[in-house]
Amino acid sequence: MKQNIVINIEGLTKTYDEFIAVNEISFDVNKGEVFALLGPNGAGKTTTVEIIECLKTPDNGKVEIFGINLKDKNKQKEIKRKIGVMPQNFNAFDWLTVKENLDYFRNLYDSNISVDELIDRIGLVKKTDSMYKTLSGGMKQRVGIAISLINEPELLFLDEPTAGLDPQARRETWNLIKKLKQQGKTIFLTTHYMEEAQELSDRILIIIEGKIVASGSPSELIENYGGNKSIILKNCDRNILEKKNIQYEIDTESQIHIIFDNNDQLFKILAAVTDDPNVEIEIKKPNLDEAFLNLTGRRINDEGLAK
C-alpha cells in the first residue's frame, strides 16, 4: 500500500441475511485529508465505517488500515490505538463537568494527554467546570470530539458530527474540524448534509443502497453533475436581450432566467443589462445538492431521509 494511503478498501461487501448493506465498494483515504462518505440513512455508511473501525467483520473484500489487513486479528489492537471515534449518539456523564468527563476517559484509555491542553484545543476553556448536562448541543458535540482525541489518534472518525445542531453551532463545529485537519489529522466524515460535505471535504464518496454512485472532490462532482449555471433577472427589459440575441426563459411576469456555459456568455448578458437601473441580478451556481439530485434523482432532508 502506498505510504500516503491510510485506508484501502477493495470489493467490500457486507450482508445481513438477504439484505446487502454494502455491495462491493472500493476506495482509498489519503493521509491528512477530510474524506466524506455521503448518503441518506440506510445507504451503508454506518456499516462501512463500523467495519473499518474493527467493530464488524466483512463478508468479502480487503480492508487495510495503516497498511494492516483487518483479517490479521492480532494487529487490530494496533489499529485501534491509532484511531479516534465520535459516534453519532455518543454518551458522556450528565453530572460530571467537562474536565471530569475528559479525565474519566483519559484514565479509561490510559492516555498521557493533558486534559487542560485538550480543552484549550477544542475550544471549551470557558466550559471547563460546567456540567455536561447544562451544555448546548454544539458544546456537547465538542466534548464528543474531545473524547475521540483522548488517545491522540492519527485517524479520526466523525459520524454525523453536526446532526441536530442549529446553523451557528454547525458552523462552529465545521471550524473545529478544519482546525483538526490543520493539525495533521486524517478525518473520515459521514454525513447526509450536502453543504457540510461541500464545505469540509477534500474528497467525497456518494453511496446509495450500498453501492458507489460517484466519487471525487466537491468541485469535480459539481462540475460533472451539478448542471448548468444560470442568471436570474428581475424587472429586465426583454427587448434589450432580444436585440443582443440572448435567449431566455420566463419564470414569472417580472422574472426570467438565462442558462450560460462560460464567463464570456455571462459577461455578454451583464453588459446587455448593466445600464438598466431597475434590473435585479442573481447568479446561481450549481452546488453539491444539485449534483446529488442529478446523480440519484432524489434529495436528502435534515433527518437524513431520501425524498
List the predicted regions and their residue ranges.
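Short, charged/small-residue-rich alpha-helical element at the C-terminal edge
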Residues: 229-299
